[in-house]
């Protein structure tokens, strides 16, 4: 039985004050809510403060991060390692986000190496996949997603997906206000799962596949009502405690 995961990607947003206010607000909003794992990925500089804030509150919120390097130490200016993230309690690490693929020229192969290194270090990769608007219009959505997943499967085996999370985020829906319909998202999720099932039905059945791309309280329930959508990777709405908590509650209710 897959357990829903709702994760907030704060991207390049926040301040010390915002971190404390948002996390304390989330703790209050989520009191008594069960049946969903809730995670947050603040900017790297705020991971320490987020850990302290969550620990002091005795919070069940999972701490994550937005990136990792391929090394645990060395002459790699500006990077952060899985070992460092572990020391601060971060467990769920986003990799392959379209913004990093585009702005930092991260290839499928490079993302797959990050995936392997996170697994080697006992952390949970949150593997982002998704197509551009042009690829969507050309009918290439499933082929693009399959290629991005196969970069992992072909180098590490399908069992590497056990315990990992896949986040399907159509690039044209990220931060644009446009969102795939729940039915369209379900169709793609089902095809992603079917692609994995070609290698292992057991892995496909158990892997969590989130939807991301303009998820809001108003549309969350429709997504989570779909059988192959196991949660959400949330951007803008994750910066507001009430909105993000409402999305998490919708997941808990839909998957109960």
Swiss-Prot record:
Catalysed reactions listed for this entry: D-glyceraldehyde 3-phosphate = dihydroxyacetone phosphate
Catalytic activity, EC: 5.3.1.1
Single annotated GO MF: triose-phosphate isomerase activity
Binding-site residues, substrate: 9-11, 175, 214, 235-236
InterPro entries on file: Aldolase_TIM, TIM_sf, TrioseP_Isoase_bac/euk, Triosephosphate_isomerase, Triosephosphate_isomerase_AS
Database matches in CDD domains: TIM (cd00311)
Protein's pathway: Carbohydrate biosynthesis; gluconeogenesis; Carbohydrate degradation; glycolysis; D-glyceraldehyde 3-phosphate from glycerone phosphate: step 1/1
Active site, renumbered: 97 (electrophile), 169 (proton acceptor)
Cellular component terms per the entry's GO annotation: cytosol
Protein's cellular compartments: Cytoplasm
Keywords: Cytoplasm, Gluconeogenesis, Glycolysis, Isomerase
Extent of the signal sequence: none
SUPFAM superfamilies named among the record's database cross-references: Triosephosphate isomerase (TIM)
One annotated GO biological process: glyceraldehyde-3-phosphate biosynthetic process
Pfam family, one: TIM
PANTHER family, per the entry: TRIOSEPHOSPHATE ISOMERASE
Description of how the protein assembles with itself and partners: Homodimer.
Entry function: Involved in the gluconeogenesis. Catalyzes stereospecifically the conversion of dihydroxyacetone phosphate (DHAP) to D-glyceraldehyde-3-phosphate (G3P).
Family, per entry: Belongs to the triosephosphate isomerase family.
Protein name in the entry: Triosephosphate isomerase
Gene: tpiA
């Amino acid at each position: 039985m897959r357990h829903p995961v709702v994760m907030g990607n704060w991207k390049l947003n926040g301040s010390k004050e915002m971190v404390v206010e948002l996390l304390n607000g989330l703790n209050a909003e989520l009191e008594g809510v069960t049946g969903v794992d809730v995670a947050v990925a603040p900017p790297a500089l705020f991971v320490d403060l987020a850990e302290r804030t969550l620990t002091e509150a005795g919070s069940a919120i999972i701490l994550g991060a937005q990136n990792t390097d391929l090394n645990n130490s060395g002459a790699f200016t500006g990077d952060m390692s899985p070992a460092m993230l572990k020391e601060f309690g971060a467990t769920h690490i986003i990799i392959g986000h379209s913004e990093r693929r585009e702005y930092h020229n991260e290839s499928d192969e490079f993302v797959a190496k990050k995936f392997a290194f996170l697994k080697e270090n006992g952390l949970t990769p949150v593997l982002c996949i998704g197509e551009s608007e042009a690829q969507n219009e050309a009918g290439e959505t499933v082929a693009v997603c399959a290629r991005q997943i196969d970069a992992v499967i072909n180098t590490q085996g399908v069992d590497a997906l056990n315990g990992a999370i896949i986040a399907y985020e159509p690039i044209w829906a990220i931060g644009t206000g446009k969102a795939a319909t729940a039915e369209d998202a379900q169709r793609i999720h089902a095809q992603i799962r079917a692609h994995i099932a070609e290698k292992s039905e057991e892995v496909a059945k158990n892997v969590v596949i989130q939807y991301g791309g303009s998820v809001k309280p108003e549309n969350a329930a429709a997504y989570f009502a779909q059988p192959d959508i196991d949660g959400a990777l949330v951007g803008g709405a994750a910066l507001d405690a009430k909105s993000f908590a409402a999305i998490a509650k919708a997941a808990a209710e839909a998957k109960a």
